[in-house]
Amino acid sequence: MALASGPARRALAGSGQLGLGGFGAPRRGAYEWGVRSTRKSEPPPLDRVYEIPGLEPITFAGKMHFVPWLARPIFPPWDRGYKDPRFYRSPPLHEHPLYKDQACYIFHHRCRLLEGVKQALWLTKTKLIEGLPEKVLSLVDDPRNHIENQDECVLNVISHARLWQTTEEIPKRETYCPVIVDNLIQLCKSQILKHPSLARRICVQNSTFSATWNRESLLLQVRGSGGARLSTKDPLPTIASREEIEATKNHVLETFYPISPIIDLHECNIYDVKNDTGFQEGYPYPYPHTLYLLDKANLRPHRLQPDQLRAKMILFAFGSALAQARLLYGNDAKVLEQPVVVQSVGTDGRVFHFLVFQLNTTDLDCNEGVKNLAWVDSDQLLYQHFWCLPVIKKRVVVEPVGPVGFKPETFRKFLALYLHGAA
């Protein structure tokens, strides 16, 4: 009686020719008599106590040891008698003290708006104006506000951030981006001898704030954290006149139907409706001046698009201004007698975006009436490229180490925003 089929015998015999003694790896024909299954065995059924009305299950709870033919008992949760943070279990959402039936749509530093600036303008009821205001541009062109050897100092700041302050051959963006901004701010502080009122300011790192408002039956909130914030003892002067503010009533906000205006916002039912400037009462520098937002992600998928960064600047400046306005004038929705002005600078260490935001009204529910104003100057290159290593071809240095395509007018705008309100 044959123990194997013809193809199986040929496969086993052929393996001996390879020096495997007849017990080597079989050929494909060895599996012609069947198909090997890849399915895993079913897991054993769970030992559960089935609740049958009128019957009491018999378990091994009283035996104090495992009995295979008895049902497994279900013990109540063990109470330690004290709260151990290692084994904390959060309560159900509907039992949380801050739970609310109405959802709140929150914008925070990790949000990326799909429609960018257009979506931010609709959420904040704002009219966009391209370019910086004339009051700021006058500070840019005034030679009295320039620093001695200004271009050379800025080039040293760039080289320090990208070359001198690190031991890496090519430093990462998360390393050099904060250093460039901090050094540029320190360079602007050198003007304190010309403008003594600069001593009435302070720069705070990683400040937080929150502001809540209603927009067409939607409850919105912005929470800011990260970056640097320049605060002052005196508020920034108003940019637009009363006539320009009244003229915004005729402006029509751009919509992006069928896309929802709350797309990419974080929907949450556990929140606290509050307006917080981030500082306690009696803080000596209560007024926001400039927010510095950094896009310092190393990986390209984690970086913000330029339009998304500008939208983040608008919403954070709006939230800071709204929290300050609610603190000064209360929670009633109305047109402000004295508008609140907040500036913002966004950068990735190479490209800068400048914003001046003026909050004219806290009546944000409907599209009619006075609008807020935002002046945006975008995509301003500080330098085109930085060579961390020299480019050598045929033993000749083609590109030396250092920045390429330096744009001195970008720092002049950076300095003008810093001096705004003091010069």
Swiss-Prot record:
Keywords noted in UniProt: Mitochondrion, Ribonucleoprotein, Ribosomal protein, Transit peptide
Predominant localisation class: mitochondrion
Record bears the keyword Plastid: no
Transmembrane segments annotated in the record for this chain: none
InterPro entries tied to this protein: mtLSU_mL37, Ribosomal_mL37/mL65
Record has Transport as a keyword: no
Subcellular localization: Mitochondrion
Transit peptide boundaries: 1-29
Pfam families (UniProt xref): PDCD9 (PF07147)
Gene Ontology process terms (BP): mitochondrial translation; translation
Gene Ontology MF terms: RNA binding; structural constituent of ribosome
Any one cellular-component term (Gene Ontology): mitochondrial large ribosomal subunit
Domain of life: Eukaryota
Family: Belongs to the mitochondrion-specific ribosomal protein mL37 family.
Subunit structure: Component of the mitochondrial large ribosomal subunit (mt-LSU). Mature mammalian 55S mitochondrial ribosomes consist of a small (28S) and a large (39S) subunit. The 28S small subunit contains a 12S ribosomal RNA (12S mt-rRNA) and 30 different proteins. The 39S large subunit contains a 16S rRNA (16S mt-rRNA), a copy of mitochondrial valine transfer RNA (mt-tRNA(Val)), which plays an integral structural role, and 52 different proteins. mL37 forms a heterodimer with mL65.
Protein name: Large ribosomal subunit protein mL37
Protein species of origin: Homo sapiens
